[in-house]
């Protein structure tokens, strides 16, 4: 089962990740956005509980899990009448629309049309959203997937204020140096991630955790005391940084 939402992460190490996380594991995932990694895990006999502090993202995924046909049908109905100019305007105010089904449909449409796979940003191309994709969305079935809205944005509070799980998963994506001390709150749909705070928080915890990054030499340096698996563009493990696309870090 594939996620209806695209992610700029484009994580290649799915097979390796499933070797690390055993079947029947309870996995708590943080920084939910596209659900690509989480849905892949839950469709392979793992229970995934995904956390986000962004209400629009929580709302979309709650509805996508419980009413996928309703959202997809709404998107199918409104998309033909949305000009490219209207879509650009909706990038700025989609989250202010009153109808939650309409908001969820816009979340889906804008993400699929954005060349950056974002909802609130990116150059738009209507041709990126195909009827086949929307038809598949109607059939989305993710029974082993649950989404939780975290009231706190403090990472330490969030990871110490939830159920007991076997593994905590942190799909981060890009390591943005300019985000370290910028104080940015991210976008309406994606969380701001302070990389230093994440490292400091995980270093102090005893539970099993997995962190996923796109390749950056700073990630290798920062997590040098932990288990690092480098993944090439084919999804295979590599020992060569020149061939590395993604990084999997574990403390177990």
Regions found by a protein language model. Give the residues of each.
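Long, positively charged, glycine-interspersed low-complexity recognition regions
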Residues: 188-252
């Amino acid at each position: 089962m594939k996620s209806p939402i695209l992610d700029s992460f484009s994580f290649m190490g799915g097979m390796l990740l499933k070797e690390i996380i055993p079947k029947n594991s309870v996995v708590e995932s943080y920084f939910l956005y596209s659900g690509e990694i989480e849905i892949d895990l839950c469709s392979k006999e793992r229970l995934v509980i995904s956390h986000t502090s962004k209400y629009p993202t929580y709302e979309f995924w709650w509805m996508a899990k419980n009413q996928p046909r309703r959202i997809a049908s709404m998107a199918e109905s409104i998309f033909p009448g949305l000009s490219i100019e209207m879509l650009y305007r909706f990038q700025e105010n989609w989250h202010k629309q009153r109808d939650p089904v309409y908001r969820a449909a816009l979340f889906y449409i804008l993400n699929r049309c954005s060349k950056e796979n974002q909802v609130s940003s990116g150059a738009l191309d209507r041709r990126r959203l195909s009827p086949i994709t929307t038809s598949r969305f109607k059939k989305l079935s993710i029974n082993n997937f649950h989404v939780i809205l975290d009231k706190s944005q403090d990472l330490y509070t969030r990871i110490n204020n939830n159920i007991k799980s076997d593994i905590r998963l942190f799909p981060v994506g890009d390591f943005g140096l300019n985000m370290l001390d910028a104080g940015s709150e991210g976008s309406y749909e994606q969380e701001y991630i302070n990389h230093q705070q994440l490292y400091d928080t995980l270093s102090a915890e005893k539970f099993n955790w997995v962190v996923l990054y796109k390749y950056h030499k700073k990630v290798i340096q920062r997590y040098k005391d932990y288990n690092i698996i480098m993944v090439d563009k084919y999804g295979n493990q590599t020992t060569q940084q020149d061939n590395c696309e993604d990084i999997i870090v574990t403390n177990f």
